[in-house]
Protein backbone atom coordinates (compact mmCIF):
# COMPACT_ATOMS: atom_id res chain seq x y z
CA UNK A 1 0.00 0.00 0.00
CA UNK A 2 1.42 3.39 -0.98
CA UNK A 3 1.32 6.68 0.88
CA UNK A 4 -1.38 7.93 -1.51
CA UNK A 5 -3.54 4.94 -0.54
CA UNK A 6 -2.95 5.64 3.17
CA UNK A 7 -4.14 9.21 2.71
CA UNK A 8 -7.32 7.97 1.04
CA UNK A 9 -8.04 5.58 3.95
CA UNK A 10 -8.23 8.47 6.39
CA UNK A 11 -9.49 11.25 4.09
CA UNK A 12 -12.59 9.18 3.24
CA UNK A 13 -13.80 9.11 6.85
CA UNK A 14 -17.03 11.09 7.02
CA UNK A 15 -18.70 12.83 9.99
CA UNK A 16 -21.81 10.64 9.59
CA UNK A 17 -19.70 7.72 10.81
CA UNK A 18 -20.08 9.35 14.23
CA UNK A 19 -20.81 6.13 16.12
CA UNK A 20 -17.64 4.49 14.85
CA UNK A 21 -14.27 4.92 16.53
CA UNK A 22 -12.51 5.94 13.34
CA UNK A 23 -10.71 9.25 12.97
CA UNK A 24 -13.04 11.88 11.53
CA UNK A 25 -11.57 15.23 10.55
CA UNK A 26 -14.12 17.32 8.66
CA UNK A 27 -12.37 19.78 6.41
CA UNK A 28 -9.23 17.69 6.11
CA UNK A 29 -8.41 16.73 2.56
CA UNK A 30 -5.46 14.94 1.07
CA UNK A 31 -3.10 17.88 1.64
CA UNK A 32 -3.74 17.96 5.39
CA UNK A 33 -3.42 14.19 5.72
CA UNK A 34 -0.18 14.20 3.73
CA UNK A 35 1.29 16.76 6.14
CA UNK A 36 0.52 14.50 9.11
CA UNK A 37 1.41 11.19 7.47
CA UNK A 38 4.80 12.58 6.42
CA UNK A 39 5.70 12.14 10.11
CA UNK A 40 4.73 8.45 10.21
CA UNK A 41 6.50 5.19 9.35
CA UNK A 42 4.72 2.19 7.83
CA UNK A 43 4.75 -1.14 9.66
CA UNK A 44 3.15 -4.08 7.87
CA UNK A 45 1.75 -6.93 9.97
CA UNK A 46 0.45 -10.45 9.40
CA UNK A 47 -2.63 -12.19 10.79
CA UNK A 48 -2.04 -13.59 14.32
CA UNK A 49 1.01 -11.37 14.89
CA UNK A 50 1.18 -9.51 18.21
CA UNK A 51 1.64 -5.86 17.27
CA UNK A 52 1.48 -4.31 20.76
CA UNK A 53 2.64 -6.12 23.88
CA UNK A 54 1.10 -5.17 27.24
CA UNK A 55 3.73 -3.51 29.43
CA UNK A 56 5.86 -2.26 26.53
CA UNK A 57 7.35 1.14 27.20
CA UNK A 58 6.90 3.25 24.08
CA UNK A 59 5.06 6.42 23.21
CA UNK A 60 3.91 5.79 19.65
CA UNK A 61 0.45 6.25 18.21
CA UNK A 62 -0.63 3.70 15.62
CA UNK A 63 -2.89 4.73 12.73
CA UNK A 64 -4.52 1.67 11.17
CA UNK A 65 -4.10 2.06 7.39
CA UNK A 66 -5.29 -1.45 6.55
CA UNK A 67 -6.25 -4.65 8.32
CA UNK A 68 -8.15 -5.72 11.41
CA UNK A 69 -6.77 -5.90 14.94
CA UNK A 70 -8.06 -7.14 18.28
CA UNK A 71 -7.33 -5.54 21.65
CA UNK A 72 -7.32 -7.80 24.69
CA UNK A 73 -6.07 -8.32 28.22
CA UNK A 74 -4.77 -11.43 29.92
CA UNK A 75 -6.95 -12.76 32.72
CA UNK A 76 -5.75 -13.47 36.26
CA UNK A 77 -4.96 -17.07 35.27
CA UNK A 78 -2.27 -15.67 32.96
CA UNK A 79 -3.47 -17.78 30.05
CA UNK A 80 -6.91 -16.75 28.83
CA UNK A 81 -7.54 -13.46 27.05
CA UNK A 82 -10.56 -11.19 27.15
CA UNK A 83 -11.23 -9.28 23.97
CA UNK A 84 -11.93 -5.60 24.54
CA UNK A 85 -12.36 -4.34 20.99
CA UNK A 86 -11.77 -4.87 17.31
CA UNK A 87 -10.07 -2.03 15.49
CA UNK A 88 -10.22 -1.60 11.73
CA UNK A 89 -8.67 0.67 9.13
CA UNK A 90 -9.23 4.36 9.65
CA UNK A 91 -8.84 4.19 13.43
CA UNK A 92 -6.02 4.43 15.98
CA UNK A 93 -4.29 2.33 18.62
CA UNK A 94 -1.93 3.13 21.47
CA UNK A 95 -3.50 6.46 22.31
CA UNK A 96 -3.28 5.98 26.09
CA UNK A 97 0.49 5.52 26.13
CA UNK A 98 0.85 8.24 23.51
CA UNK A 99 -0.84 10.71 25.85
CA UNK A 100 0.36 9.63 29.29
CA UNK A 101 3.74 8.02 28.60
CA UNK A 102 2.83 4.94 30.67
CA UNK A 103 3.47 1.34 29.53
CA UNK A 104 0.99 -0.31 27.16
CA UNK A 105 -2.15 -1.45 28.99
CA UNK A 106 -3.28 -4.23 26.63
CA UNK A 107 -2.13 -6.66 23.99
CA UNK A 108 -3.06 -6.09 20.37
CA UNK A 109 -2.87 -8.81 17.76
CA UNK A 110 -3.70 -8.92 14.08
CA UNK A 111 -6.85 -10.67 12.96
CA UNK A 112 -6.02 -10.00 9.29
CA UNK A 113 -2.95 -8.77 7.41
CA UNK A 114 -2.53 -5.01 7.22
CA UNK A 115 -0.39 -1.95 7.75
CA UNK A 116 0.03 0.41 10.68
CA UNK A 117 1.42 3.92 10.37
CA UNK A 118 3.56 4.65 13.42
CA UNK A 119 3.51 8.20 14.76
CA UNK A 120 6.08 8.59 17.55
CA UNK A 121 5.30 11.28 20.11
CA UNK A 122 8.40 13.28 19.15
CA UNK A 123 7.32 13.27 15.49
CA UNK A 124 3.88 14.53 16.48
CA UNK A 125 5.53 17.32 18.47
CA UNK A 126 7.44 18.39 15.35
CA UNK A 127 4.18 18.26 13.35
CA UNK A 128 2.42 20.32 16.03
CA UNK A 129 5.09 23.01 15.96
CA UNK A 130 4.91 23.25 12.16
CA UNK A 131 1.11 22.91 11.86
CA UNK A 132 -0.52 23.92 15.18
CA UNK A 133 -4.07 24.20 13.78
CA UNK A 134 -3.86 20.76 12.16
CA UNK A 135 -2.38 19.28 15.34
CA UNK A 136 -5.28 20.73 17.34
CA UNK A 137 -7.78 19.23 14.88
CA UNK A 138 -6.06 15.85 15.12
CA UNK A 139 -6.03 15.92 18.93
CA UNK A 140 -9.77 16.65 18.99
CA UNK A 141 -10.36 13.74 16.59
CA UNK A 142 -8.34 11.50 18.92
CA UNK A 143 -10.36 12.75 21.90
CA UNK A 144 -13.55 11.82 20.03
CA UNK A 145 -12.23 8.28 19.51
CA UNK A 146 -11.33 8.03 23.22
CA UNK A 147 -14.78 9.29 24.19
CA UNK A 148 -16.53 6.72 22.00
CA UNK A 149 -14.37 3.92 23.41
CA UNK A 150 -15.05 5.01 26.99
CA UNK A 151 -18.78 5.26 26.27
CA UNK A 152 -18.75 1.74 24.77
CA UNK A 153 -16.89 0.39 27.80
CA UNK A 154 -19.38 2.04 30.16
CA UNK A 155 -22.23 0.48 28.20
CA UNK A 156 -20.64 -3.00 28.40
CA UNK A 157 -20.12 -2.65 32.16
CA UNK A 158 -23.78 -1.74 32.70
CA UNK A 159 -24.98 -4.93 31.01
Question: What residue ranges belong to the model's regions?
Answer:
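Cytosolic regulatory regions built on CNB/CRP/Popeye-like sensor folds
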Residues: 1-159
Amino acid sequence: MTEANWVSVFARNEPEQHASDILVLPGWGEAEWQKLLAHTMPRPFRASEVVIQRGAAERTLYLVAAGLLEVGVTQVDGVSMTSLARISSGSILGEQSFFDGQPRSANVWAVADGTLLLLPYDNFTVFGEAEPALARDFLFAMARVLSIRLRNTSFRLRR
